[in-house]
Amino acid sequence: MVGEAIPFIVAFSLSASIVWLTTPIVRSIGIRLGIVDKPSSRKMHKEPVARIGGVSIFLGTAAALLICWRLGWFGILPTPKEYQIWGVTIGGLLFFAIGLADDFFDLPAIGRLILQLIVAGLAWLVGVRIEFITLPFVGMVNLGLLSCPITVLWLAGIANAVNWIDGLDGLAAGVSAIAALIILITSLFMEQPAAALIAAALSGGCLAFLRYNFKPDRPAEIFMGDGGAYYLGFTLAGISVIGVVKTVTTAAVILPYIILAVPLVDAITVIFTRLWRGQSPFVADKRHLHHRLVAAGVSKRHAVFFIYALTLWVGSLALAFSGMTAGGTYAAIGTLIMLYSCWRVWRRVKLRNHS
């Protein structure tokens, strides 16, 4: 059992170590080149901050996977699974490049979206595919020709959803770390090592990045930028497809939507609100969940912790729904944490209203 876990432990540890060591270097380069996120009325920070931290997350995750490959650990995968792992890795690289180009050159929204749809389509071609969905009162449905557009929408949609929640220090990295760990556990339970290997590396990189991106007593030293957020979002969406949806059961088909419910529901809510008001869905505003929590009187730090708890809660429900033996226990613990977080938020809002 321990021997079987070694590739995943090594992937996690290598990625975390590389991100921990390279982030200060990347930060210095970003400041020297002037690649910084400047304060504005829509943003929460007050001072310019380097915004290319995604470089270190990508380097750590990619290097960990390459080392695992050189050590021969991809040999545990059947050939189609190896294609899928490279499809997610290379697709993540291209999404990272799109975001990094946006960090440098401020690309138009429609141009970014077109490039993302093309890359997501290429990922579908190499086997990163949603082939089934579950419908109420119908059950599991084979998508057939609809597999391509639905997969492309999922991959590009989650990438943008993670980018949109990257509005408070540590938020996107922490949510991504929790989601990646949940996908790691479910993928191992469902015997999907390809997704588990990427999830292990991704979660390690995200947790190490929090060392510089989430400071309880002072502002973040560096932001991940669009490059990092797009990379995390695409990779999470990709591994949820190859690691969970590929297991053809009703439970497996709906698990990705539960695990990634926080960024997904936030994005859908904001898009429909903008369209309802006659606005472009690409126009930035302050309607995201983290904006609403802060506006209600919750501190930025507690808003982040609340969304962490929410992500952990839906993840625990996914573990319970997956059918694993301890799933009910995980869900109970996650629910208790969520209830406590709700009480803390309610208490802070109440104190603010009475002051």
Kindly label every feature range from the protein language model.
Residues 244-355:
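C-terminal membrane-associated helical module and adjoining short loops/tails
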